Amino acid sequence: MKEIYQQMVEEVLERVNGKKSGLTSEQVKRSREKCGWNELTEGKKKGILQIFFEQYKDFLVLILIASAIISGMFGDVESAAVIVTVITINAILGTIQTVKAEQSLQSLKNLSGPEAKVLRDGTIVQIPARELVVGDVILLEAGDMIPADGRLIENASLKIDESALTGESLAVEKNMDTILTEAPLGDRANMLFSGSFVTYGRGKAIVTDIGMQTEVGKIAGLLKSTSEKQTPLQVSLEVFGKKLSIMILVFCGLLFAINVFRGEKISSAFMFAVALAVAAIPEALSSIVTIVLSFGTQKMAKEHAIIRKLQAVEGLGSVSVICSDKTGTLTQNKMTVEDYYIDGKRISAEAIDISDQAQKCLLNYSILCNDSTNENGVEIGDPTETALINLGSRYGVEAASVRKLYPRNGELPFDSDRKMMSTLHLIDGKNQMIVKGAVDKLLKRTEQIWTKEGIRKITEEDKEKIQRQNQKFSMEGLRVLAFTYREIPKNHTLTSQDEDHLVFLGLIAMMDPPREESKAAVAECIKAGIRPVMITGDHKITAAAIAKRVGILHDLSEACEGADIENMSDEELKEFVPNISMYARVSPEHKIHIARAWQERGMIVVMTGDGVNDAPALKQADIGVAMGMTGTEVAKDAAAMVLTDDNFATIVKAVENGRNLYQNIKYAIQFLLSGNFGAILTVLCSSVAGLPVPFAPVHLLFINLLTDSLPAIALGLEPDRSEVMSEKPRLADESILTKDFLSKIGLEGLVIGAMTMISFLTGYNQNGTLLGSTYAFGTLCLARLFHGYNCKSDHPVIFTKGLFHNKWLQGAFVLGTVLITTVLTVPGFHNLFKVETLNLMQLGCVYLYAFASLPIIQLLKWIRMKLRKRGER
């Protein structure tokens, strides 16, 4: 069966059981029983409890739960309670971040318009848009939102803003012509689409689709079917947690075997192995990562980037492709006059001289032959006409004043057949008709041309020169209007026959220009190893002009249209996308396929946009970024991040923040794991040597939950490093647990473990197990506090200004030092923490062993750095 836009109006009326005079109440009832209400169905939303329990799916958390259960079974209620408390706090934090349920479908539902004017029982009535049915006849005029999809059956110069749906910045001229061939959404000139706006003219349409069957409804379906994806950090932490748990279980199993071999009871050996597992697993890791990410969202909010999904903070830092919408994202979403062409000369809009007679005349005529208004910043009318009004305002020529001085005495409205508009005014005592329209149409009716020397007969050479300039403007993506005029006898009624014998005055070229920051932002992306790609519903030439101006497109061979990829297989598209930097005339489905093709190549994809048409692709992409000022609620709700200033440059800053944040999280993880590895080595060495266990469970819990958490959070707040934007994005499948990262953790843990073991032996030899355990506890605590300075950079920092530039780390170090010193020296704490109260000499010994790990690790960093530089030569 033919599509509705390919059928004659009579065929459409028969197909939907409608008629031009509208439906009767009985017909409305039958249609509603068949098609339902004009609304969108909502997806099933997760409840708070479901979201809360989903926080326990992490493999590391499951290991901790198992450890808590086993600890409780063997009587270690203290350890079990602490573990349960920590993972519960983490689950609450995660729930708070994700409890904002998706509102995309509700936004789409609201977009369909609250009310509609419709013909019912032969009369015009206004009803809630929800009550529309297929077959209804709707009446539309400038300013109306279209409440349902429909076929145009009456047209009076109707123009529709479809930018939110198709991405095309210019209002679309509608007509009733039947389209015989297949046409993309943006080229169906006889159709009206739900959620679009009437900018000019009037019309009637027969409703052909409502609710989920409209083009907006189909996008709603795509939103429901597009699955949520894990961000790179989620993937990395999941892999990391499993590997870490396996390593710890191997260590604990080895220790269990050693203790059984030494003759200990199986229950005691097993309990100790579980205790060690609890000590080794960084209970606070997930919470710390969540807290650091939360701080990141607060920082980014101050820089105009609102994070809706927590992990998107990190995900932005790892993107390798940004697929950006054109209209309103890279451009201002506002038509602006760029150039004049008068008397054979091109004049920039910035260089217009209103003291020049011809330029002032063209400015006035563009305001007079114009139906748009801009009062108190409220623009009403066609965006092209509004651009002409705004240009006048820039030069102090206000539309209201000009129109009052030269009132309109007659008009011939624009229509798609004539492609011109005419108005009649009394100017300087002459009855002047101003005609604007398409260049080729007006040149055919032009007999004279204005020049500085005076008005003379236009020649073929003049016309060819004007056409060449028109083509040049068009190749630059500019929309061009020609302006002509003639004198009409007074008291004459205008007809289309009067649009002849015209005097050519000039051309005005305009476009939706790039944002001022876009070019620099694109250059910064390229410098950072990120591939910018423009995807738009606009025309190829217009889009290519913008893409070239901002630096995305260098050659037209890098541009294509949606039709070029329509029939490509997934594999073909995967091979095709690296060669293309700009896609024009695309549909929402095309956007999803393009994003998926890049993902199949191992790229982490950002999709930016602001229209309804962007929403499904925003969800398909790894990170969806919506515009907050010009963006629809649909796009905002589908996105992981919303830019409150609609500034493409904010994305670049967000990428920089994301990269810094990911590095800071790595520093925090390095800090936690190397310290825990030091504790494991100390316990393992003591067990192998047949010595008493150096730590009581309360020692390990004190370290993990108090003196570890604060420095780890502080490391997550390390000041930004600008050099991160000179680095390439990390690989999509790169785990946090790289060989280099593991080797650093192992080496640093070895140093901390060695100093702790030496300290334990010192105290043990002085006064037995309790003093040795106290020495080991104090040394491990303080060594890990000093270790925070080791983890703040991959390079040595001990003799640099950067050592103390993190105020949060200074605070964490001071607080942690005060806590452990109080526990070791105040007599009242010795029973609670199972320590021996230390004198000043003993405390100094503990501090010395703890501090020694700092210069040793810094020396090892310096050696690694030198070896790496030598290897790069």
Language model regions located:
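Membrane-water interface at loop-to-transmembrane-helix junctions
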Residues: 731-750, 770-775
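Alpha-helix capping/termination and helix-coil
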Residues: 370, 602, 655, 659, ...
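Helix-coil boundary and interhelical linker segments in multi-pass alpha-helical membrane proteins
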Residues: 687-696, 760-772
